[in-house]
Amino acid sequence: MRGCACRGTAGVAHVSCLTEQAKILVAEAKENNSDDNQGHRWYLCGLCKQDYHGDVRCALGWAVWKTYVGLPEDNRYRCCALAQLGTGLGAMGRNEEKLSILEACWDIEKRRARAGAQVDLLAIQGKIANCYGELGRHPDALRVRREILAMRRKIYAPEDLPVLHDVTNLGVSLNHLRMYTESQPLWRKYIPVARRVLGRDHNLTTTMIKGLAAAISQHGDAPRDGLLEAIKMLSENSQRLRQVLGDTHPETQQNECSLKFLRGRLACLETKDT
């Protein structure tokens, strides 16, 4: 089973091996009282540092849940495992089930009411907003994402990863609702920040670029210029995604689909002008 997005034959692993590795690393971090609890091992490839997706993400969601389900309901590891199960189900398109699980996580976290719980609540709230978007409930997703970003800015600096992540999600919601006059300046403001802080190959950077390309190709008084700019951005994005994720990764294929669509629109526009 292909366990990550690594190139060539690298990354092929059994889910049972990935599960055992995650268990060991999380247990070691807990024993050593490490600030990094290694929880990301359940959803992030240790080699290429990209998120698992599809069948693998779903299988690991069930694996992490089975690992920690016996802990008390308010135990942090159990709460995180429940959220990972929801994300895994979402990876297979089971978004109604995912939403129910995330809402249960939200209720548990609120009841815990411990120090620092705000960050965990925002993380779950973000997953709920993502699920709203996947279910086509874009106004609900936008409302929640505005709330999240407002709270996050009170906790983090503008260039911190959580803020950049929330900005990306907000921009996606604005694009879905065709609110390009708001999303376009947001993308243009934060893409240089993401490039400087995260690098050009980071998934948030490439997602922001796709978001800006969508916004400028759909909005503006100069459709041809907008299409040319968007095509240039997606072409550069395509090269990076192929190098980092490979040709068959969903993100690469989605970028290619958008690029093909915009090239088709440009060809139609130029045909009309001749």
Model-predicted regions and their roles:
Residues 8-11, 15-274:
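Intrinsic-disorder-linked linear interaction elements in eukaryotic regulatory proteins
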Residues 1-2:
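Soluble N-terminal domains of membrane-associated systems
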Residues 5:
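N-terminal C2H2 zinc-finger "knuckle"
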